[in-house]
């Protein structure tokens, strides 16, 4: 191996020497040529006319190398180490290049072989699968064509057997389990219904509580009677104000459950009836017994009511209250009192009758809750509190105020009440997070976009004429109508009306009226005597004097000296001033009256 490397190195050095010698010879020869002739193609045909180039011979004598015996051991060892390291590096680089080439070639070959093997395998699998399918169809077709009747009988028997197996498995497997589960659920429901007692009665009069009623209308007429479709009374509802800017109808849930065809009636004498089926549910809870409804457009104006503010369960405290009901003589207000809580309901002392369900309890002009019914165990009525729904019945922000004194509900009860309406809040949040497909909300649009329809393209009429077609029968008898202008129609109507007026009769009647007024004798104008005003009676008892000074307005009339007469006189209240005679009653109105003699008038003359 070492001899081969040395031989290869010798060949490389010899080829390098020959290449360098040839290059130096070419440079020396080209240096004697002028610049304009060495590379100019035009002088090639005059080469024989040029003088021969000058020949120069360079001689260089190399010094004779020193013999190796004269070198020192250090130089010899250094030369041997350098020679061995260079030979090793050359051999290593050559081996590394050979190994890298072999690795690249082997990797490429392996890759090509693997791709080819996978491709052949997939194609073989495809051919095998297609062959099996084709063989199956061929065999099936051979059986059907040669043994048609037995094959159809076998298919029918297979179908019947399959459905029989399913029926047997259901009868002996799923059916008993289904029957047992239904029986167990019925027993459980009946047992729970027998054990559970009703939470509240619909109406109740509280024993020992003194109440009074006064004729009074609800605040803002926000209480609305609810009736059945037949017109019989069912309960009450109220119009409340929400924090999203809308007005909602609030009532008890059991009123809507017991009266599916309920109708809201105006209590202000308006003959307006709105079915509650046209209202959409905003929030509802069977256990909380409060339902909020969104009405059709302008339902408040149709029922003649305005929205009132509400107090949620988190801010409810013990206080005095009032409940309204509609009697034969009109609205009456009954006294009530909130005393505490029972679970998620509020204990109220009040006297109620049948049909009061859904009526709100007020404290001033604010709604506290909805009348739900009477307690089945205690001596009090129950009021359903209004849940705190952020964005609906309560604001989305938090007030920086202290807690209300005498709060009815604890924090756990408030959380339980809000949990009853958790599903409602999910729907509200989904509505808030709604994003249209276009990404642009209707409320954010400044103006509605105009819709332009494509008009029919106007044809020039210069195309190729169609075939002339003759009529096969008589023409159409439908007369052609032309559009009449409205202005022309009005002119025709006015001209026809003017033509019917008889001017001669009008002139005759005018002359008769004027002559009758001119021949009338004027009536005598007599003055009426002014009415005499009754004089006030004089004081019968004179004032007592003590000898002290009394102001003039306190002194008696007898003690006052007579005052001097003023220089001027009070003008007369009569219409005619002094110096002028009253006009005679027989003088007509158009005759000029005599001027007054009090002097010339200072007013400007009229034109």
UniProtKB/Swiss-Prot annotation:
Q: Name one GO biological process term.
A: proteolysis
Q: What is known of its domains?
A: The C-terminus part of protein P1 and VPg/P1-C25 displays RNA-binding properties.
Q: Which UniProt keywords apply?
A: Hydrolase, Membrane, Protease, RNA-binding, Serine protease, Signal, Transmembrane, Transmembrane helix
Under Enzyme Commission nomenclature, its number is 3.4.21.-
Record site: Cleavage: 203-204, 400-401
Ranges annotated as biased composition (Basic residues): 520-531
Question: What name does this protein carry?
Answer: Protein P1
What's a single GO CC term here?
Answer: membrane
The record lists the organism as: Turnip yellows virus (isolate FL-1) (TuYV)
The main enzyme category here is hydrolase
**Molecular-function GO term, any one:** serine-type endopeptidase activity
């Amino acid at each position: 191996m070492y001899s081969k490397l040395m031989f290869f190195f010798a060949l490389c050095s010899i080829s390098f020497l020959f290449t360098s010698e040839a290059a130096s010879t070419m440079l020396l020869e080209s240096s004697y040529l002028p610049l304009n002739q060495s590379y100019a193609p035009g002088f090639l045909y005059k080469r024989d006319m040029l003088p021969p180039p000058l020949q120069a011979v360079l001689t260089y004598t190399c010094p004779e190398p020193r013999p190796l015996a004269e070198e020192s051991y250090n130089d010899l060892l250094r030369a041997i180490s350098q020679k061995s390291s260079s030979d090793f590096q050359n051999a290593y680089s050559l081996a590394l290049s050979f190994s890298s080439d072999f690795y690249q070639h082997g990797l490429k070959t392996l890759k090509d072989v693997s791709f080819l093997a996978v491709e052949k395998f997939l194609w073989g699998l495809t051919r095998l699968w297609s062959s099996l399918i084709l063989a199956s169809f061929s065999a099936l077709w051979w059986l059907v064509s040669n043994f048609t009747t037995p094959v159809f009988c076998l298919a029918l028997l297979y179908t019947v057997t399959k459905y029989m197996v399913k029926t047997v498995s259901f009868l002996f497997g799923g059916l008993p389990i289904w029957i047992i589960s239904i029986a167990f659920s019925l027993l459980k429901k009946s047992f729970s219904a027998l054990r559970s007692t009703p939470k509240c009665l619909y109406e109740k009069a509280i024993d020992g509580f003194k109440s009074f009623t006064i004729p009074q209308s609800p605040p803002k007429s926000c209480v609305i009677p609810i009736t059945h479709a037949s017109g019989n009374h069912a309960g009450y509802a109220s119009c409340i104000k929400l924090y999203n800017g809308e007005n909602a109808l609030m009532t008890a849930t059991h009123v809507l459950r017991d009266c599916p065809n309920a109708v809201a009636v105006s209590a202000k004498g308006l003959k307006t009836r709105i079915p509650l089926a046209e209202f959409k549910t905003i929030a509802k809870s069977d256990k909380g017994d409060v339902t909020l409804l969104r009405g059709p457009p302008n339902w408040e104006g149709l029922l003649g009511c305005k929205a009132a503010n509400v107090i949620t369960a988190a801010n409810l405290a013990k206080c005095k209250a009032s409940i309204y009901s509609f009697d034969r003589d009109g609205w009456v207000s009954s006294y009530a009192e909130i005393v505490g809580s029972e679970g998620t309901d509020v204990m109220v002392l009040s006297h109620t009758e049948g049909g009061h369900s859904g009526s709100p309890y007020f404290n001033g002009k604010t709604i506290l809750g909805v009348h739900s019914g009477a307690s089945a165990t205690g001596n009090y009525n129950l009021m359903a509190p209004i849940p705190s729904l952020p964005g609906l019945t309560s604001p989305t922000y938090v007030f920086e105020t202290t807690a209300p004194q005498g709060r009815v509900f604890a924090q756990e009860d408030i959380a339980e009440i809000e949990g009853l309406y958790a599903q409602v809040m999910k729907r509200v949040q989904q509505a808030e997070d709604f994003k249209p497909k276009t990404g642009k909300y209707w409320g954010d649009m400044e103006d509605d976009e105009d819709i332009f329809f494509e008009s029919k393209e106007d044809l020039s009429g210069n195309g190729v004429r169609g075939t002339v077609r003759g009529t096969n029968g008589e023409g159409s008898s439908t007369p052609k109508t032309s559009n009449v202008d409205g202005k022309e129609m009005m002119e025709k109507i006015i001209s026809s009306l003017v033509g019917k007026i008889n001017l001669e009769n009008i002139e005759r009647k005018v002359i008769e009226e004027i002559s009758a007024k001119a021949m009338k004798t004027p009536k005598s104008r007599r003055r009426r005597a002014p009415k005499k005003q009754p004089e006030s009676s004089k004081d019968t008892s004179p004032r007592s004097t003590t000898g002290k000074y009394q102001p003039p307005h306190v002194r008696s009339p007898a003690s006052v000296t007579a005052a001097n007469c003023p220089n001027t006189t009070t003008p007369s209240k009569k219409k005619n001033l002094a110096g002028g005679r009253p006009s005679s009653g027989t003088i007509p109105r158009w005759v000029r009256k005599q001027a007054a003699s009090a002097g010339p008038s200072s007013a400007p003359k009229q034109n």
